[in-house]
Amino acid sequence: MKFEKATIKDINMLTDLRLVYLQEDLGVITDKQLIQESLPGYYEKHLNKDLMVYVARDDEDIIACAFLLIVEKPMSPSFITGKTGTALNVYTKPEYRNKGYAKKLMTMMLEDAPEQDVSVIELKSTEDGYLLYKSVGFEDVVVKYHNMKIVLK
């Protein structure tokens, strides 16, 4: 097994893994074709710039991945560099699960993030992933704010 950052050559596999992840997480994806057509361009624009993707390979096949999306915003005492990260799309193909691959990828992410000047990494955890994230140092967050959103499209 080889653990490394994804490169531009991995765009097709990353697109496929993202779609599989979304289907497992959400069920039926109504805009699947649009997502499939748009993701390669997104990866070309962002990969290894403000999107780091850590992958596990079995030969050339990517069998697990973890994404770190880096955003720069006005600094605050809670993110003093102004750069925050969001961990997402942590996914392992079913036949490779429970072997520690996701933990290795998360550890790589946490070691690499300070080199990217990231102050803090946040994530939303499923029940399945909760213990994994706790094991690498993530903590539950109690906030005084309400999480809100508005859907525009």
For the regions a protein language model found, what residue spans apply to each?
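Conserved acetyl-CoA pyrophosphate-binding loop and the N-cap/start of the following alpha-helix
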Residues: 96-108
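Conserved GNAT acetyl-CoA-binding A-motif
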Residues: 106, 113-125
